[in-house]
């Protein structure tokens, strides 16, 4: 019997339930971000049982990566299946968010959240002169909500269509839009389509977190983990 299976069998029934919920969350969202309040308990649970999760996902050709410096877990399909392919408009928003993340990060201490307003996203969109007008409010809402479903950002105040809405940007953006893609940004945006991809389960990725909460165990431990992960 493989070691991770033995470790799983030794778990309490309560922890096995937590394992199921956490594994499903990873499949739905691709990332677990320590800095995101709703992810933190799952991040800690994965960190505590990393070998079990990696062994479990490896059976289906998934690799669970731990970006310790950024405190992010990323689920990656080794065979490059179950991928979501972003269209051009979605790609523009991804690149804008990554640019804003970098700009804000320079001005903040490492312990603080990176927050942007809706109007900052709109201003950056127009400043790049990619298109001569903003997308509709409904289209912006759809894109931002979809990206939130991947734990790339989180709406904190207001509505997705509100220019005064506040969003927290997460370091998982750096996994989706890496430095190489930023360097070739002009060339990429000249395409009709773009090959940035994310892992995708068969479930609807635009589900609100509250729907997921219906199956969550309320008393998942939140004690600090003493492993190697950086927080």
Language-model features and meaning:
Residues 33-41, 108-126:
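Short acidic, hydrophobic short linear motifs in intrinsically disordered regions
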Residues 1-79:
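Eukaryotic partner-binding/assembly regions in large regulatory complexes
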Residues 59-66, 148-159:
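A short, conserved structural fragment
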Residues 73-75, 154-177:
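Accessory beta->alpha helical hairpin/"wing" motif in late/C-terminal subdomains of nucleic-acid enzymes
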Residues 170-205:
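Short, amphipathic alpha-helical interaction segments positioned at domain boundaries
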Residues 209-231:
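Long, low-complexity, intrinsically disordered segments
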Residues 9-10, 78-115:
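Short alpha-helical segments that sit at the start of domains
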Residues 45-53, 133-149:
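Short amphipathic alpha-helical interaction segments
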């Amino acid at each position: 019997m493989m070691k991770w299976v033995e470790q799983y069998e030794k778990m309490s029934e309560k922890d096995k339930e937590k394992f199921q919920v956490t594994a499903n969350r990873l499949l739905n969202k691709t990332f677990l971000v320590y800095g995101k309040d709703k992810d933190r308990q799952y991040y800690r649970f994965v960190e505590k049982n990393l070998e079990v999760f990696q062994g479990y996902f490896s059976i289906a050709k998934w690799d669970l990566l731990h970006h310790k410096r950024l405190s992010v877990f990323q689920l990656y399909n080794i065979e490059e299946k179950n991928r979501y392919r972003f269209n051009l408009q979605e790609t523009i928003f991804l690149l804008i968010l990554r640019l804003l993340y970098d700009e804000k990060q320079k001005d903040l201490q490492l312990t603080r959240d990176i927050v942007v307003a809706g109007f900052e996203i709109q201003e950056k969109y127009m400043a790049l002169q990619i298109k001569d007008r903003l997308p509709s409010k409904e289209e912006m809402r759809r894109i931002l909500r979809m990206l939130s479903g991947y734990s790339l950002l989180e709406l904190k105040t207001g509505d997705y269509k509100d220019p005064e809405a506040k969003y927290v940007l997460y370091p998982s953006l750096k996994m989706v839009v890496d430095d190489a893609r930023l360097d070739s940004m002009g060339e990429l945006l000249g395409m009709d389509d773009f090959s940035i991809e994310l892992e995708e389960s068969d479930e609807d990725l635009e589900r609100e977190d509250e729907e997921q909460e219906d199956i969550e165990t309320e008393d998942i431990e939140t004690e600090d983990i003493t492993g190697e992960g950086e927080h």
